[in-house]
UniProtKB/Swiss-Prot annotation:
Disulfide bonds: none annotated. The keyword Cytoplasm applies. It comes from Clostridium botulinum (strain 657 / Type Ba4). Methylated by PrmC. Methylation increases the termination efficiency of RF1. Keywords: Cytoplasm, Methylation, Protein biosynthesis. GO terms for cellular component: cytoplasm. The keyword Phosphoprotein does not apply. InterPro entries: PCRF, Pep_chain_release_fac_I, Pep_chain_release_fac_I_sf, Prokaryotic/Mito_RF, RF-1. The modification N5-methylglutamine is found at Q233. This is Peptide chain release factor 1.
């Protein structure tokens, strides 16, 4: 590990010199690429330097203990040795995590697709609850939320809705939300007070660049039609809504949120690219994946990942067996406690995989 850390530190110094070179700065595209690479290495290098400083301090205290006869100074050195030993253990764990293979999509913006599942109108209302939860979470993170497409019901639910969330680290945090979400509650329309179970499916897709995926224009069928609002009523007198069908895969994306047909087409193309990229990544991952007990981070949508139980005020994440009794604040966007636990579990699995490889 130390050999790799020394290599990274040297690379960081090399990049520091390059990004301050006027001849490199003249090429803005190359300069921005180098700046990003430099920023990605910064936390590793700073942690490694802190680790080396702690090691030096530890050796210094050990030398003092050998040579010093003063009782108070010896006690002080012994106390510092204990503290530094613990600090070094913590820093070593931190460095191990920082050196784990990084998901190349972690820095990307995301699309979140929420679809009502089993449960009819109640499932559509739950989809609306999930949309609000992610919107509130994005607000806490100062991320931007943009509606891409929606299919609303008459009483405020969503059969399906897609939003774009833009902000630093959006995919790295939200990727764990892919899967089947289950709600247990008494619907407002239920006179007997019986608890119903409904589901909604969430898909989190990284926004992809044009260089990430290439789409042949001949593979697309683009239809335009008049946008409709709640209950199907027409809200536009021009054919501004767009439906794009990717013929080889059968994937269909619609967008009618904008008044402009061109803007709707641009939005729909972004979502289509993200879906095609996800499908390609899933196929690639499936071909090389090892058997893993946990599905944390894989985005397996066939798996029920979380239950929201209203009568008990409970949220249970089934992937890691974590239960919290804070349903109201959780649905108000306070979801970081669960996400942190999922990140930790994902890191632990990666460390196990690394151990098997080594």
């Amino acid at each position: 590990m130390l050999e790799r850390l020394n290599f990274i530190e040297n690379k960081y110094e090399e990049l520091s010199n390059k990004i301050s070179d006027p001849s490199v700065m003249a090429n803005q595209k190359e300069w921005q690429k180098l700046c990003k690479e430099h920023a990605d290495l910064e936390i590793i290098v700073n942690t490694y330097r802190e680790y080396k400083k702690a090691q030096e301090d530890l050796e210094s205290d050990k030398e003092m203990l050998k040579e010093e006869s003063d009782k108070d100074l010896r006690e002080m050195a012994q106390e510092e040795i204990k503290e530094l030993t613990l600090k070094l253990e913590d820093l070593e764990r931190e460095l191990t995590i920082l050196l784990l293979p990084k998901d190349p999509n972690d820095d990307k913006d995301v699309f979140i697709e929420i679809r009502a599942g089993a449960g009819g109108e109640e499932a559509a209302l739950f989809a609306s609850n999930l949309l609000r939860m992610y919107t509130r979470y994005a607000e806490r993170k100062n991320w931007k939320v943009e509606t891409m497409s929606l299919n609303a019901t008459d009483i405020g639910g969503f059969k399906e809705v897609t939003v774009a969330i833009k902000g630093k680290g959006a995919y790295s945090r939200l990727k764990y939300e892919s899967g089947v979400h289950r709600v247990q509650r008494v619907p407002d329309t239920e006179s007997s007070g019986r608890i119903h179970t409904s589901t909604a499916t969430v898909a989190v897709l990284p926004e992809v660049d044009d260089v990430d995926i290439n789409i042949n224009a001949n593979d697309l069928r683009i239809d335009v039609y008049r946008a409709s609002g709640h209950g199907g009523q027409c809200v536009n007198t021009t054919d501004s809504a767009v439906r794009i069908t990717h013929l080889p895969t059968g994937l269909v994306v619609t967008c009618q949120d904008e008044k402009s047909q061109l803007k709707n087409k641009e939005k729909a193309m972004k979502v289509l690219k993200a879906r095609l990229f996800e499908a390609a990544e899933a196929e690639r991952a499936a071909s090389i994946a090892e058997d893993r007990k946990s599905q944390v981070g894989t985005g397996d949508r066939s798996e029920r990942i979380r239950t929201y139980n209203y009568p008990q005020g409970r949220i249970t994440d089934h992937r890691i067996g974590l239960t919290l009794y804070k349903l109201e604040t959780f649905l108000d966007g306070d979801i970081d406690e669960v996400i942190e636990a999922l990140v930790t579990e994902d890191q632990a699995e990666k460390m196990k995989d690394l151990g098997r490889v080594n």
